[in-house]
Amino acid sequence: MMMAPVPADAQNFFERLFGGGIKERRERDVRPEPAKPKKRVKRVKISAPSYYAYRPDKLEKVSFSDLIEAPRPASFEPSLDGGLFDEAIGGLEDFDLRAYQDVAAALTAHYGDKRAFIWVSGFSPNGRAAEAVRVLGAAADFGLEPADYAVTVPAPGFSMDQMAARNAELIRFEMALSAKVLRYVRDAWSGRVDPNRLSGYHDFPKKPLDLKKVLDRLAHTRDVRAYLESRHPQNERFAVLRVELEALRASAENDIVVDPKLLLRPGKSSPELPKMLALFARETDEAFRTEHAALLESSKDSELYDEQLVPLVKAAQAFKGLRADGIIGPRTVAAFAGESRAARIAKVEYALERLRWHPSDLGSPHVFINQPAFTATYVEGNRDTLSMRVVVGKKSNQTSFFYDEIEQIDYNPYWGVPQSIIVNEMLPKLYRDPAYLDRAGYEVTDARGRRISSSAINWGQYGGKVPFNVRQRPGSSNALGELKILFPNKHAIYMHDTPSKNLFERDTRAFSHGCVRLADPRGMAAAVLDKPVDYVAAKIGAGHSSEKITRKIPVYVAYFTAWPDQDGKVDYHADVYDRDSRVQKALDAIAAVRQPAG
């Protein structure tokens, strides 16, 4: 039976009575014709910075032609060496001395101006030369390679009948020693390795060094050793690492060696367990040993990891700052058994090299983020006044290695989503669901700052750089949490809070996109501001705002697999990004240039 159509006046009556609800429901129930799909461009991911094959500086032959051909100065004033330098200068003819370009330039500039010996008095090397040679020979004390600075010193005896040969020997020794001293100063000042040639993650300003002025200073200084050693970093951490290096070289290999791949769970047995129990007793403190003395003694020969030992293992893990899960695995073994002596020596030498890339004085106060340790420390007066766990970048999104200066704190911040995350992670979702950003609490703006609905954009036409800015509004789900601490840099890295607090319980904390998540962001903000934590809490409670930092606070986003604490104890860490091997390859490449085989 067919129903009669509803008269128009009756339909209008129902619409007036029910507010158009019938019509709206009918319209909602009607599915629009699907839009013709638009062609989607191919997505091109934004790649992370890369590591490079290290290319060391080459050595060039020093040209002494200008020195040799320069006319002798006509002067009635006696020279410091009685004119011996000019008498000997011809000995540089055909002298094959190799040096870096800046060293070669400093040599010819200094001796072109001064035309006098620094390292020779009369017809023999002087005391200043002897002191310089001793310093160069002790380069290993600073983690350098003595062979890089070796110089043949002329014998004290010579024949007066062979003065031309003696003069040639002395002038060549003069130039060779000056070249090696300048190489030493160059290495001590800024390191052998240029960090920016290692990878796109390394970002250090060039440390200015006037090598001609170094020679000018050495020509007059009374304490060659003090001057040369002052070219190394002059901070307490460098000094502690030097002491550690000396102690390691004098030490024996580890007397208790444990399988580094051990994985022992409760209820299982292993011949490695007695070794670990011995290490728990030795590598903790008196309070720990007293509390667990009975169990350590009764179980010292047991290979069975039974339930009564679980609290002991957890306590030992907590003592070392590890996650107390009761599983004796590689990180627990590394924390107690340590690495081989050779591995620790290498890590200390890498640390000494990396410190040379930094300012000699790290400043007070400063913030030191050590990525392999997963820690951030506020340091004032060489004391670690605040230290906390951090989360750093995943291996695919590594945190860069650089330093900067803290400028601002944002409370209840917006999160400006980096282009790499928009393209690599958000675009695939937006292809399927253009309204995704609207629903997830993000704002989209164009280049002129105008707000645009995410659903109104044809995301399919963008495969690489997206011409829109995306930011997440403040709130409990905001990726930056309550605050962020800014030190503007080209890597878009900063310190911030996070809603993902559970990650701080992990031992290995490389989970972010590169920024540094703080376990105690309020504490760090209070330290940076030199204010109480309550002040920071009040600022957070007041809503979104920013506050400038009015004092100089350097921040070091650093990478050290060996680093000393304030009490002089050096801790060793896993090479989470495999950067130690990159430094070693660079050092090998440099050695091949400086000391070619054959």
Where do the language-model regions lie?
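Long, acidic, intrinsically disordered low-complexity segments
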Residues: 100-142
